[in-house]
């Protein structure tokens, strides 16, 4: 995702829109400002943050933090920073509020399902049970400066809430640039603030 290839599209009434691919999906952000410089600076700040977020937390990127943690399962803790710790604490909260339904350690289960197979098959009960034995957010050892998965084969996947978290953060970035009217749509996960000029509502579908 190159910044130079994602230019704000100027719409009517001071409304701008940027469209791009990130986080494995199509993204679109609409926002209003009277300043062309603010429109461009917000674009740059947003795309930089999203690119950094994806590089750090995507399990599909070999050198991401999540990939490092997964490779180190059962071997050694992995150092984290304050932003990482904030994200892991959010996982704690979501796991508690959903009574365990939300669990970022379900990667072993995801790995036994081949969703790209021409003829999908259901994993055997023994494979499912074996994968379940490596699942459990409560087993994750989270410290202020490191995180550790205690058993080899355990794995994290932030796909269940990564885009939602990113939507909230991009909305905060907009506010930091003085933008009070915006719609952030990252692959169907949407948040709005304010409203477009000349109308009271954002169109989401």
What role is predicted for each listed range?
Residues 1-205:
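Mature catalytic core of soluble alpha/beta enzymes
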């Amino acid at each position: 995702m190159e910044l130079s290839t994602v230019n704000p599209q100027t719409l009517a009434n001071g409304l701008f829109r940027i469209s791009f691919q990130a986080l494995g999906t199509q993204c679109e952000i609409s926002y209003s400002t009277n300043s062309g410089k603010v429109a461009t600076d917000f674009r740059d700040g947003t795309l930089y943050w999203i690119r950094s977020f994806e590089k750090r937390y995507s399990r599909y990127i070999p050198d991401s933090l999540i990939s490092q943690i997964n490779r180190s399962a059962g071997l050694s803790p992995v150092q984290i920073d304050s932003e990482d710790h904030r994200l892991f604490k959010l996982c704690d909260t979501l796991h508690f509020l959903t009574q365990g339904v939300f669990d970022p350690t379900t990667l072993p289960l995801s790995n036994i399902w081949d969703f790209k197979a021409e003829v999908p098959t259901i994993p055997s009960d023994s494979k499912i049970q074996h994968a379940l034995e490596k699942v459990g957010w409560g087993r994750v050892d989270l410290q202020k400066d490191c995180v550790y998965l205690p058993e080899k084969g355990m794995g994290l996947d932030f796909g269940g809430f990564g885009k939602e978290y990113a939507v909230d953060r991009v909305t905060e970035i907009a506010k930091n640039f003085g933008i009070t009217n915006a719609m952030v749509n990252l692959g169907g996960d949407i948040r709005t603030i304010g409203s477009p000029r000349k109308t009271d509502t954002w169109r989401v579908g």
